Amino acid sequence: ITGNQAITTKKLKRVMKKTNEKGKLLNLFRTKKFVEENFEADKQLIIDKYNELGYRDAMIVKDSIKSYDDRTVDIFMEIEEGQKYYLRNVTWVGNTLYPSEQLNFLLRMKKGDVYNQKLLEERTSTDEDAIGNLYYNNGYLFYSLDPVEVNIVGDSIDLEMRIYEGRQATINKVSI
């Protein structure tokens, strides 16, 4: 692996779940056969790891697989990390039910934080106290949130959180 500076080669190898080095104790319970689809999934895991650390432009620019012998392959990857990005401003558009301050509190991402796309996804939709759950738990089943990068200056990103609240759903009939 070349081109990586923000994450060590050792850590990148650990990120890969299905593609692994021969002769490591860690590989005892992992697959032994090289599978191209698993390698593609592992490459995406590497990019996801970079995205978590603020490297939203990270990409694997080259990769090659070369047969070493009958039983093993050598894998070469070149990574282009790009620059690290930070959150500058978060603005909310379309929210009428809850004030921006309350939504910012639930988002728990503030100016100067590393731009972590995984954390953004978790805090808007998958966490137990995610913003989506605030709406869903109050009957806004048609709610949607679209985080849009509206301005990128240097290493800073302005996010516009576009909310469509929709109508509140009500229960019409209950049959038991």
Task: Walk through the language-model features, giving the residues of each.
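Interaction-mediating elements
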Residues: 1-176
